[in-house]
Amino acid sequence: MTGRSCLTIVLAAGEGTRMRSSLPKVLHPVAGQTLLAHVLTAAPSGPGTSLAAVVGPGHEAVADEARHVRPDVMTFVQHERLGTAHAVLAAREAIARGADDLVIAFGDTPLISADTLARMRAPLQAGASLVVLGFHAADPTGYGRLIVDNGRLTAIREQADASADERSITLCNAGVMAFDGKTALQIIEKIGNANSKGEYYLTDAVSIVRESGLTAAVIETSEDEVRGINTKAQLAEAEQVMQARLRKEALDAGVTMVAPDTVFLAADTSFGKDVTIEPYVVIGPGVTIADGAVIHSFSHLVQASIGRNASVGPYARLRPGTSLGEGARVGNFVETKAAVLEAGAKVNHLTYVGDAHIGANANIGAGTITCNYDGFGKYRTEIGEGAFVGSNSSLVAPVKIGAGAYVGSGSVVTRNVPDDALAVGRGQQTVREGWARRFREMKLLAKKPKTG
């Protein structure tokens, strides 16, 4: 919307009692981000834009999340919950600054897109004073109907007040609105509370606009995009819709998914070219996967960076702070945390690598554990380039294994190992010839029944 300034207000003051949760409704996650984060991310950004969030009293966590997602956000408190128009006026100070466009969105509609919010501003540039977002409902029962005449919105009719003909209308009110900034404040301030609940409803703005001889318009979108979240069941439905959207975007970008419906992505997952994701993979927030990488089945990744042609899994868990270099391998039943594996490093089986740096082309044998925690603090393990750690070894941090060094299988390493050295830290093997035969004979003799 070139040349037009815009203020977006996101209403996030609801208690969300039907969620039956101590967590504020808008802080529940969909695809690894809070409901509020999705809406704030979709809001217009850049030069000429401003953003406000209206939160409930005592909901500092909601305000903190808003500032975390969009540091430019202004936060306002709605001290009494007296309807949507009352909530908007909690941000009166921001509205009074006089942006060209005012967009009002809801913090519990995580599927709303930036494109839809941008489309709502176009009729304002063409002269409309109010734009309402609508959708065609598969079952419109309970929704306010949008009454349109010759392309102009004339009314929002609630279910209880609708005639039989009006109830047959499937175009429904999504709640999201955009106002011409020059007249927005005076229109919203005219909204009264002469209704059974004594609340101030934003939907009444339509009649005020019409009575003032101004124009109201409708922009349509899909029903999925404007799903509001009020229950855990609706949260699960939104997750399903979002995952379908993310999978399609990934497939369209060239990611190979053997069984897409079994793969779960985060909203911020980033893929390179020729990435392959096998069935039953869960990717949490903060994951980037570079060209040619393969994520094998039953792997779980969060806040991890996967390098070119790297391989993960099957049955691998990559926790925050994991970084795999080009061609690195993390195999089956391996867990990593705050671990850097340089190019070509291999951790193929049954291993825990935490608070560690593994040099290029190092090989970590099956059953190796970096013992990084002593009950009070975490300590680092450094493994040099080309080092070889034998199976079933314990590396007691803080410890350094030098470049090219070998650690014998079954070792407990408590001191630094120099470059190209061999470290063996285990008991010496003892062999007793014939011991097993004598042991068996003794046990069998003891089992024979005693005779009187």
Curated annotation (Swiss-Prot):
Cellular-component GO terms for this entry: cytoplasm; membrane
Linker, as annotated region: 233-253
Reactions listed under catalytic activity: alpha-D-glucosamine 1-phosphate + acetyl-CoA = N-acetyl-alpha-D-glucosamine 1-phosphate + CoA + H(+); N-acetyl-alpha-D-glucosamine 1-phosphate + UTP + H(+) = UDP-N-acetyl-alpha-D-glucosamine + diphosphate
Region ranges (N-acetyltransferase): 254-452
Reported cofactor(s): Mg(2+)
Assigned keywords, A-Z: Acyltransferase, Cell shape, Cell wall biogenesis/degradation, Cytoplasm, Magnesium, Metal-binding, Multifunctional enzyme, Nucleotidyltransferase, Peptidoglycan synthesis, Repeat, Transferase
Spans annotated as Pyrophosphorylase: 1-232
Protein name in the entry: Bifunctional protein GlmU
Species: Nitrobacter hamburgensis (strain DSM 10229 / NCIMB 13809 / X14)
